[in-house]
Amino acid sequence: MTGQAERVFELESLKNNEVLRYSSKIVAFTSGKGGTGKTFISVNLAYAISRLNKKVLFIDLDSNLSNANIMLNVVAGKTLYDFFTGRSLLHELITKYEPNLHFIFGDSGKSDYPKPKAEFIGQLFNQIRALQNDYDIVLLDTGAGAGEDVISVLLNADKNILVTTPEPTAVMDAYVIIKFLSSRNYSGEKMVIINKCVDSNDGEVTFNNLSLAANHFLKEKIDLLGEIKYDNTISKTIKAQELFIKKYQRTEVSLQILKTAKRLSEIIQVANINHPNKKSFL
């Protein structure tokens, strides 16, 4: 109990003694349905942004079904399980994958994994914001679906990226996420990545349909961040636990990911020009 009390005291100190100045660095990935390639996109984007000489923190928030560490073939030490059970503070979970790319991994298959409630998400974001000025961008990979834990993360993030595909079910689920955010008066930027496109027209048509529906029925504006082509090599790298953009740098998919990474990096940089750094925990 003494150790737990010390953790709570340290958490409150972080919350009260640090001036958590507003920034626009925290970006959450969501998809609505599974199978859109959200984690593949987010992990490869994180790597691509880090290669642009930007420092990236990636947090895998897929509660008890995390797989970013599996995709990277990394054995995680401490995970978000340790945070949500009060064993560790967030900065103690950081795995330094490369100098400019750090990860906080989740865990999978824990029978006692606590369901992240609103108060836990609030504590999580207090600590994320205490870390954010050590990084140029913080990427959050949420779980599939529209559960309250996922929506809470999206509402707390500065910007959201919806990863969808041309499949009608995926587009509808993306629309539902936008509807949830709209009903909760979320004012952050909402961007879309169309994954698994057959060609450029496929992505354009998909985005236009989603954008028109969001604007007409919800009065919401969404922006196209990128289009990623379907490539059957992707599944091979996932099975081999290899990072696609690192192994196949000259493919069309990798170039599209890099283009999307540059665009996102520029958006974040412009949004944060007037926000200086503060004290570091690292």
How should each PLM-predicted stretch be described?
Residues 1-33:
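Extreme N-terminal, non-catalytic leader segments
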